[in-house]
Amino acid sequence: VDDETMYEILSRLKELGGIAGVHCENNGIIQARLKEVLKTKGGRKDVSDYPWTRPKEAEAEAVSRLLKIAKCVDTPVIVVHLSTAAGYREILRAREAGQTVYIETCPQYLVMDEGKYSLPAEEARHYMIAPPLRKKKNQEVLWQALKEGRIQTIATDHCSFTKEQKMAGAEDFSKTPCGMPGAEERPALIWQFGVNENKITAEQMCIYLSENPAKLYKLYPWKG
């Protein structure tokens, strides 16, 4: 989505009393790095190159740009499936300046890291999601943000594909459909790695998985 279209979407949602949930990655950076991998390596079969093509800077820049557009429109937004500390810092800066910004993250960014992309290619492709899994240090920042109530929801970005569909990227990882399942596993993962490990409370888990999403999307108190 180009900036003009985003401005128009946010403006219309403001008129309707709605709110946008926006995936934030700079596609120009991604496309340039995909070309660079092809040029330097002569192919894109090595899945371990995948996270390099979608760096944390691509997320942080897109978050920053979205928030500036939202400020021009004077409307709140939701940054969905936040995966990096860099993107989180952009949101904190906007909040400090008075903007209303909500954050969603997902279990995959809380419990897995980019080491999955060093597995054998057939297995590694199963973990190709967008944004990609990140370095482990980002998990600590996201968990702390959840503990402090600075992240509002934990969703899944559920988008499942079969093994056969993932094989579309066997010769070129950029052809792999990005996504993985998560809706069924989300409560168990957050309970085990969040509540049982004392990173968040059981009450917070209920707020992030149920109450806050219902409030953000105007389903409360019928849901949540």
Question: Model-found features: residue ranges?
Answer:
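Histidine/acidic residue-rich metal-binding segments in metalloenzymes
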Residues: 1-154
